[in-house]
Amino acid sequence: YRLKLSTVRGGLRSLATWLFDEDSPATPELVEEFVAACRSRLASGMSPSPRTDELVSVLGEKHPGDPGIIVAFLMNPVSLRPGEAVYIPPRQIHAYQSGLGIEVMASSDNVVRAGLTGKYVDSAQLVEITEFSALPPVRVAPEHPSATTDRFLAPAQEFELSVTTLAPGK
């Protein structure tokens, strides 16, 4: 199966179309072979990206055979510490593996899933609306308008998050 790799965007769109097409040969067994290959690289110490291969291994346990595992393999892994933020532009596939976070997004009734869920995945809609671009993460540093408040301003004007920490008993 050849991907049109004339551009990254075209290649990623072709891959997503191939993965999520209901007639695709990307069967659960093929996904399991992919997971096994990542685990083998980890075990041999030959992984070019241990963090990504470990993610694939964990997702393979949680969501066996799910084509979303291959999508996760292609994503930029980002770790956030408490008090850190990242901005994801609209129409970009994103996910979190673990931890607690706040997601601020535009009012919408069209959450489209790319896998790793027991919920419905509308693959045709996913491929149609997703902007397949290889983008670096955009970290958002907080401003400190007061001693007790951090304010996160996203590159999109309509998004702002303020976190105020009160002293105990206040």
Describe the role of every protein-language-model region.
Residues G99-R151:
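C-terminal, non-catalytic macromolecule-binding modules
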Residues R41-G60, L126, E131-H144:
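Long, charged amphipathic helices and adjacent flexible linkers at domain junctions
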Residues S79-S98:
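Conserved metal-binding segment of the jelly-roll/cupin
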Residues V86, I102, F159-S162:
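A broad, low-specificity signal marking well-ordered, structured residues that form hydrophobic/aromatic
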Residues M75, R139-K170:
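A short glycine-rich, His/Asp/Glu-containing loop-to-beta-strand
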Residues E54-P82:
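Conserved AWS/pre-SET-to-SET junction and N-terminal core of the SET lysine methyltransferase domain
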Residues Y1-L59:
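Long, charge-rich alpha-helical interaction segments
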Residues K62, S79, S107, T164-T165, ...:
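Short, conserved beta-strand element in jelly-roll/cupin
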